[in-house]
Each structure stands twice: as C-alpha cells, then as structure tokens.
C-alpha cells in the first residue's frame, strides 16, 4: 500500500465539500505526492473519480469500510 504524504479528514461533509477540501490540500503537495482522503458521503465515490480524471491527478485506491470511504490520490504534474 502507498504511504500518504498527507491525510484529509472529510468525514461528515456532504458533496461537494470533500472534493473542494481535497483540491485545497493538493495545492500544498508536490507533484507525485499522495493525499489520503477519508469521507462518509456515498456520493464522494463518483465525485473523486470524476475530479481526478478532470484535474490530472491519479486515483490510486478507493475503498469503503465501516461507512468510511478512503481514497489515495497522487498529485499530477
């Protein structure tokens, strides 16, 4: 498993806030670094898939367990 450089706890936030906060957090990371996002909004699955495709970032992993969605996103160039 990839070790994240930073973690964003977006649990309890509804669409579009998890993606908005992730975008702000990604601005702090360097190219190739990995952000882990924790969210509870089921809509975040499609949101993160679409956002990473549109933004040039790479969705490395997407998992769900105990009501928490965990995403690993590698920052693009």
Where are these regions (language model features)?
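Residue-level detector of transmembrane insertion/anchoring sites
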Residues: 1, 11-13, 31
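Compositionally biased, disordered extreme N-termini, encompassing classical targeting presequences
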Residues: 1-5, 76-77
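Short amphipathic
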Residues: 4-11, 36
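Amphipathic, hydrophobic secondary-structure cores in small proteins
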Residues: 16-58
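C-terminal structural segments of small proteins and small subunits
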Residues: 49-77
């Amino acid at each position: 498993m990839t070790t994240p450089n930073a973690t964003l706890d977006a649990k309890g936030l509804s669409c579009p806030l998890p993606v908005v906060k992730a975008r702000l957090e990604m601005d702090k990371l360097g190219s190739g670094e990995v952000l882990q996002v924790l969210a509870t909004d089921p809509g975040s699955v499609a949101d993160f898939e679409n956002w990473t495709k549109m933004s040039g970032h790479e969705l490395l992993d997407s998992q769900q367990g105990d009501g928490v969605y965990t995403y690993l996103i590698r920052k693009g160039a």
